[in-house]
């Protein structure tokens, strides 16, 4: 993998080389890729310059990772396409089951998609309770471009 060739072979990796490719390592790499792609998205709108936090948030809320882009980035099979918005910071609710076989984690299922009819009411209820407890006024996504 490129990460082994360009990072670990040069002694620049922060994790143990044997952790490369494991589920928790991959989650970190995916999260980093999403952050970079959000910045790229924001720079397409605001210019190729240092961005403000608000501009990066705009990039996250307008991120559209297609299957083609995921493949181009070398992440095919690691995540499903996702499209984020002000109202949906997840972008997708897909997951797979991993199982430890005593030596390594192995994917043992196809992709599952969360049931929004169950999940979204729970998310909204929990978010509203948190906002009330912390005295936070939630953003009105109808006013966001």
Regions found by a protein language model. Give the residues of each.
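Processing junctions and N-termini across compartments
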Residues: 134-135
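Segments of small-molecule ligand-sensing domains
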Residues: 12-25, 32, 36-109
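Extracellular/periplasmic periplasmic-binding protein-like sensory domains
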Residues: 1-31, 111-118, 125-126, 138
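Glycine-rich phosphate/pyrophosphate-binding loop
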Residues: 129-130
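Sequence contexts marking disulfide-bonded cysteines in secreted/extracellular proteins
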Residues: 85-87, 140-144
């Amino acid at each position: 993998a490129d990460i082994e060739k360009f990072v670990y072979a040069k002694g620049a990796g922060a994790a143990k080389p044997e952790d490369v490719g494991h589920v928790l390592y991959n989650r970190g790499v995916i999260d980093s890729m999403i952050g970079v792609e959000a910045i790229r998205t924001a720079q397409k709108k605001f210019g190729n310059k240092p961005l403000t936090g608000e501009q990066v948030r705009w990039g996250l809320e307008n991120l559209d990772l297609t299957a083609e882009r995921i493949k181009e980035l070398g992440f095919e099979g690691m995540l499903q396409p996702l499209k984020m918005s002000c109202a949906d910071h997840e972008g997708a609710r897909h997951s797979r089951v991993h199982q430890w076989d005593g030596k390594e984690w192995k994917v043992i299922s196809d992709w599952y998609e969360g049931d929004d009819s169950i999940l979204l009411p729970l998310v909204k209820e929990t978010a509203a309770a948190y906002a009330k407890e912390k005295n936070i006024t939630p953003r009105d996504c109808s006013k966001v471009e």
